[in-house]
């Protein structure tokens, strides 16, 4: 999620054509497909399938958490698609490919401590900590559009510091959210739990791409990121008031 945008921006800034950039994406997809094809799993005897129902595709107990995650992924979708244009719009001249480089570093750093805390059962606490950081980052990202009038060098430093913190925030929440969904599901629905987690994330990113582009078209990107920051606040309060109590009540492990 960080290496792809980073590589694409570096290639684009090096005057590489879009045909080559998308060809690289296609090659990466083919390599991923081959790697997935080579994965071997133990044979499992076919089991009788239950009638098709909603809970075969969506973990019903995970819907509250899915809503919270969806709200968080909307501004993330704005970031992965529009942060380069936003930086150009407000006047940041440094390569925005480094934004995703630092974001990837932040995600890697977060795994050094977040996984251990999740293993100790502090799932909701880890998610809330990540949410606080992400809320700050998106408000800060929006604020860059205003504070750049005072100092370009300081805004540039702040802009890239946000990317590092954003990587830490999302990197902290990703495994914790996945664990939260899985712990709400019986063993027979672990796949459904992961599917619900990923669907919520992907739908939010799609909404972020559409809504972020529309807001930027009628206004500016800094307003789009301000709207995204407000959504993270809604997600935080919803998680604190609904998702966390729901999880502690219905968790199975």
Where are these regions (language model features)?
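Helix-loop-helix hairpin linking two adjacent transmembrane segments in secondary transporters
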Residues: 1-37
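Helix-to-loop junctions at the C-terminal end of transmembrane segments
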Residues: 12, 110-123, 216-217
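Helix-loop boundary and gating motifs at the non-cytosolic
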Residues: 62-69, 73-92, 99
